[in-house]
Design a protein with these regions (language model features):
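Cleavable N-terminal export/targeting peptides
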Residues: 1-36
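Subset of outer-membrane beta-barrel
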Residues: 25-307
């Protein structure tokens, strides 16, 4: 549509307006999906409308298209246990008001391995445990039947050493369209303020132009499938893409699988599998990463409630 063409044009213009965001990246964890439902499809979730609890860290413009009125979940992720050995806690909720307005809130806390702190003589005087925190809020409006727009805004911070932490404001802006079973979206993710180090060097966030497409269908009454495809072009010059699918039986049992090509982006390549069960609104989701690199053995679990 002409509206989507204008959005893509604006996104292209933003790439020219923010050359300072290229190069080394700050707060790379802001580019990661950590909730179990999204990790089950290798992070492909921009047009996902069934599990919307994590929309504050993804695409809030999808919320007004959801058949769910309210969705909340809390999760725990063993992030890259074969490499960085971090643990992440995430909490999210989204509310779909009359399929017109969408509101989302999200919180993420990352706990990284402790390291020894030494004094000038080299003697160990204690330990420090680095941490990451992100808080997001989003709002979306579906102004015509087939089209919505939405924006998330939040603050992310990393504490790297005692007395040394840095943070940045960041936003995601998306438009999404849905035509029968097909869904498409385009926008900018993680656009925000630069981070300045103690030396005065500036580092940009992992900002990307993001597009997504999806197809969902129900068949033989009790079966449904949701196929998702996302792609990101990072202002640093890297490209990434993810494809995933979810099969659901009677809106009670789901199985998921996906693959992400990471290239030189902030997140490496990996494959994933996942599963979920739902009963009386209570849902449990699991995801496991299959990879030979840093994502090997990453495991996510979440417990939520939706209606």
């Amino acid at each position: 549509s002409s509206v989507m063409k204008k959005i893509i044009y604006i996104v292209g213009a933003l790439m020219l307006l923010f050359p300072a965001l290229a190069g080394a990246q700050a707060l790379p964890f802001t580019a990661a999906e950590t909730d179990a439902a999204s990790l089950g499809t290798a992070g492909a979730n921009l047009t996902q409308t069934h599990s919307i609890a994590g929309a504050a860290f993804s695409n809030v413009a999808a919320v007004p298209f959801s058949e769910t009125k309210f969705d909340a979940a809390a999760g725990f992720t063993m992030w890259q246990p074969s490499a960085v050995k971090s643990n992440m806690i995430n909490v999210g909720a989204a509310y779909n008001m009359k399929n017109k307005l969408g509101i989302a809130l999200g919180f993420m806390y990352g706990m990284n391995p402790a390291y020894d702190v030494t004094d000038a003589s080299g003697a160990v005087k204690g330990q420090f445990k680095p941490s990451d925190i992100a808080v997001n809020a989003g709002f979306a409006y579906r102004f015509i039947e087939n089209l919505s727009v939405g924006a998330n805004i939040g603050y992310a911070t990393s504490s790297l050493a005692e007395g040394y932490s840095y943070g940045a404001l960041a936003a995601d802006v998306f438009a999404m369209a849905k035509f029968n079973n097909f869904k498409v979206t385009a926008g900018v993710a993680n656009i925000g303020t630069a981070v300045t180090s103690k030396s005065g060097a500036k580092f940009g966030l992992p900002t990307s132009v993001a597009v997504g497409a999806g197809y969902e269908a129900e068949f033989a009454e009790n079966h449904s499938i949701d196929v998702l495809l996302d792609a990101d072009y990072y202002f640093m010059g890297a490209f990434a893409a993810a494809a995933g699918a979810t099969y659901t039986f009677k809106d009670m049992v789901s199985v998921r699988a996906g693959y992400r090509y990471g290239g030189n982006s902030p997140l490496p390549s990996y494959a994933s599998v996942g599963a979920g069960v739902k009963f009386a609104g209570v849902k449990l989701d699991l995801a496991y990463m299959l990879a030979s690199g840093p994502m090997k053995n990453t495991l996510a679990i979440s417990l939520g409630y939706s209606f």
